[in-house]
Amino acid sequence: DEVKKSIFWMLFITIGLTLAAIFDGLNNQDMTEPKNHLLEFNPMKYNTYQKGQCTYYVFDKVREDHHQIANSWHDTKDWAKNAKKDQYKVNQHPKEGAILQTTEGKYGHVAYIEKVNDDQSLYVSEMNFKKPYEISNRTIPANDVDQYQYIHPKENQHIS
């Protein structure tokens, strides 16, 4: 009988914690217009890209800006194509906070645009341009800017 009670309470607590983890619950900070976040998924909550790679770094930079990109675009050589499929703006017009993308190399590469300089060169930050886990910065000369695609992250509507 004591074993059954213990099992019941462990199961009850486990289910409660699981539900709390699945649902962010109700956000009633603004009581004039309470917003229900049940079943609402924040695509930026978990970075599923491989640590130490350019994709992982760029995902985190976009998240810091309270913007969003998909966590399922795979190799960077496919990011522009996959972003277009997901209704993201992809073009050859760089902007601060956008993602520079190239198909060069075996897997391609992405970098985060920190600044568009007055001379139209780009100051970018990136990871794994030189080696895994290494964050570096460089300037893309203005005459090379048209060699890349630029993915423009969306506003993240899922943050409270």
Per-region residue spans from a language model:
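N-terminal secretion targeting segments of exported proteins
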Residues: 1-39, 155-160
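Secreted/periplasmic proteins that engage bacterial cell-wall peptidoglycan
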Residues: 30-110, 126
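Structural motif
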Residues: 58, 116-118
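Aromatic- and glycine-rich peptidoglycan recognition patches
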Residues: 118-160
